[in-house]
Structures are given as C-alpha cells and as structure tokens.
Amino acid sequence: MHPTQIILRPVITEKVTILRDSVKKVAFFVHPQSNKIEVKKAIELLFNVKVMAINVVNYTPRVRTRNRRKVHVSGCRKAYVTLAPGEKISFFEGL
C-alpha cells in the first residue's frame, strides 16, 4: 500500500493535544488493514521524523440512538505514534 493510503487523516482532539504536549504522541486514523510496521514506515516517509513506538486501537462499528432513531456508526482504526526526542511534526504545531 502507498503511504498516503495508509495514513487517512490526523486526529485532533483535546486528549491528543495533551498527549502531544506531555509525552510527544500524535494520533492518526489509519487504513483498517494496515499493521504497525506499515504505519511506522508511512509516518517516517511522509513526515521525515523518527518513530519510537506505535500503539493501534480498533474501534468496532456499532449502532447508536439519536433522536429515537437507530444510527449506524462505522468503525475505525487509530494509531498513536510516539516520536523520538527532539522530533516534531509541523502539522500539529500551533494547534
């Protein structure tokens, strides 16, 4: 798979902002069939940074109730990337 197909989009939430500032972790939504090795290579290639560790979380699809209606929420795969000391991704700076 091409690196731009593996990394779908960044995750920008309060939790990720706190992790970025304290432990140098950033998060991305990744392709559901990608593995840690592919994600690591894609991040290092696209952003020119050194990756220390990758943690991957799978969110299962589920049905939620909104306004008395059943709504299907699709599942996703999220990768938390720990960067090496001194490394940073310029996209996340200033958020």
From Swiss-Prot:
Keywords attached to this entry = Ribonucleoprotein, Ribosomal protein, RNA-binding, rRNA-binding
Its GO CC terms are: ribonucleoprotein complex; ribosome
Q: Which PROSITE patterns match?
A: RIBOSOMAL_L23 (PS00050)
MF-aspect GO terms: rRNA binding; structural constituent of ribosome
- At the top level, the lineage of the source is Bacteria
Q: Which Pfam families match?
A: Ribosomal_L23 (PF00276)
- Cross-referenced InterPro entries, in alphabetical order? Nucleotide-bd_a/b_plait_sf, Ribosomal_uL23-like, Ribosomal_uL23/eL15/eS24_sf, Ribosomal_uL23_CS
In its keyword annotation, does this UniProt entry include Glycosyltransferase? no
**Which terms does the UniProt entry file under GO BP?**
translation
Q: Does the keyword rRNA-binding apply?
A: yes
**What interactions and quaternary structure are annotated?**
Part of the 50S ribosomal subunit. Contacts protein L29, and trigger factor when it is bound to the ribosome.
Membership in a protein family: Belongs to the universal ribosomal protein uL23 family.
Annotated function: One of the early assembly proteins it binds 23S rRNA. One of the proteins that surrounds the polypeptide exit tunnel on the outside of the ribosome. Forms the main docking site for trigger factor binding to the ribosome.
Please report the name of this protein according to its UniProt entry.
Large ribosomal subunit protein uL23
State the organism of origin: Lawsonia intracellularis (strain PHE/MN1-00)
Question: Which gene is this protein's source?
Answer: rplW
